[in-house]
Amino acid sequence: MFFKMLKEDVDVVFDQDPAARSYIEVILTYSGLHAIWAHRIAHALYKRKRFFIARAISQIARFFTGIEIHPGAKIGRRFFIDHGMGVVIGETCEIGNNVTVFQGVTLGGTGKEKGKRHPTIEDDALISTGAKVLGSITVGRGAKIGAGSVVLHDVPECSTVVGIPGRVVVQNGKKIRRDLNHQDLPDPVADRFRELENEIRQLKQELRRKEREDEL
């Protein structure tokens, strides 16, 4: 079972990366594969309470790959890290099957609380370059997180989230309409003009008062 999972980690590279040409190339040169293999060994030791050895393997993998995966994180089958540099996955993170993440992704916490404090990523999700998914939230099955997004709340399944903070723009293949009342949007320039008009009005009133005093 364990070795079958390792082979699936190789196979998913060919499914997801058109640049992959041979098993030798993938096994020897793909840092994402090296990181996930190291994690599977570290996680097995972590479950047996061999915490120090598990963390040591994790840190060695981080040094060689630039990918940091806490050995306590639970990761499903056919997990693919594309490019990978700067990926961080926290201790209580749970990742389902057939999940893809790109470089610079953080699956992290939002504080120092104990217990479940990292995201749950369900099957078939995709998290694009530089996205940050933070806190004990759930990214639903088949969801997509856009590049550079910051996600702080649950993401429905089969939806697409973009932006800071992340917002749903597509769900079940349909665009989400968000009507904006533009007249209610803040306008700092207009606000400053109103302040200047008030100041000018007050100065004119003060000037007229001074003129009346001089006439007397």
Swiss-Prot record:
Its main location: cytoplasm. GO terms for biological process: cysteine biosynthetic process from serine. One of its GO terms (cellular component) is cytoplasm. Pfam families: Hexapep (PF00132). Pathway: Amino-acid biosynthesis; L-cysteine biosynthesis; L-cysteine from L-serine: step 1/2. Gene3D superfamilies: Hexapeptide repeat proteins, serine acetyltransferase, domain 1. Belongs to the transferase hexapeptide repeat family. PANTHER family: SERINE ACETYLTRANSFERASE. The lineage of its organism: Bacteria, Bacillati, Bacillota, Bacilli, Bacillales. Catalyzes the acetylation of serine by acetyl-CoA to produce O-acetylserine (OAS). CDD domains: LbH_SAT. It is found in: Cytoplasm. This is Serine acetyltransferase. One of its GO terms (molecular function) is serine O-acetyltransferase activity. Inhibited by cysteine.
